[in-house]
């Protein structure tokens, strides 16, 4: 029991490092970049808030919230990989698998298995839970960038409207009622010069 709880507490201390992993997405007020912990919290809250619009059958919102909490934990060791950074995405899978091995090994076996399976399910994006989670994860980032008016990651990585639309496709599948809002936001950001047509 004592070793178990000590390992869990060590894991929690390392998980606190998510607050120091900064993303390429700014806060809505544009004052600074958000960190992984803030993103994960906003992702979970967005999943809860927009769940009534999900059209996928069999989605377990509690599992989606767990995915939101663990989906970026590996970035503590692997670092953030911006979606629009094509060169960084080349090594993403390998870096994140190595990080998952290192991070989840800190937990007791059954927790390690649960957390890793949540992370792998999210990453594979094959189940209704994972598709909804991916849709919300991507929407949260899109929404923050759009609402900030800075274009942050879109400008930095010369994002085209095609790349942004492709990135947002899980939303069209899981929450189609939001798709027109996304299209309007993309067009608005094209007109502002923040997304390349």
Q: What is the role of each PLM region?
A:
Residues 1-197:
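Alpha-helical, largely C-terminal catalytic domains
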């Amino acid at each position: 029991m004592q070793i178990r709880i000590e390992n869990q507490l060590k894991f929690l201390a390392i998980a606190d490092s998510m607050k120091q992993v900064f993303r390429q997405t700014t806060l809505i007020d544009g004052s600074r970049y958000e960190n992984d912990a803030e993103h994960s919290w906003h992702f979970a809250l967005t999943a809860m808030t927009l769940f009534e619009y999900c059209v996928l059958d069999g989605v377990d919102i509690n599992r989606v919230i767990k995915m939101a909490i663990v989906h970026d934990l590996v970035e503590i060791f692997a670092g953030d990989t911006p979606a629009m950074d094509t060169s960084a995405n080349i090594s993403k899978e390998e870096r994140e698998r190595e990080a998952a091995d290192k991070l989840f090994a800190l937990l007791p076996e059954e927790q390690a298995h649960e957390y890793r399976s949540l992370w792998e399910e999210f990453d594979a994006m094959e189940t209704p839970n994972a598709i909804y989670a991916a849709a919300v994860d991507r929407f949260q980032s899109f929404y923050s960038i759009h609402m900030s008016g800075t274009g942050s990651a879109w400008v930095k990585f010369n994002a085209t409207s095609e790349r942004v639309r492709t990135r947002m496709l899980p939303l069209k599948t899981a929450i189609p009622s939001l798709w027109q809002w996304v299209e309007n936001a993309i067009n608005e950001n094209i007109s502002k010069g923040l997304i390349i047509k």
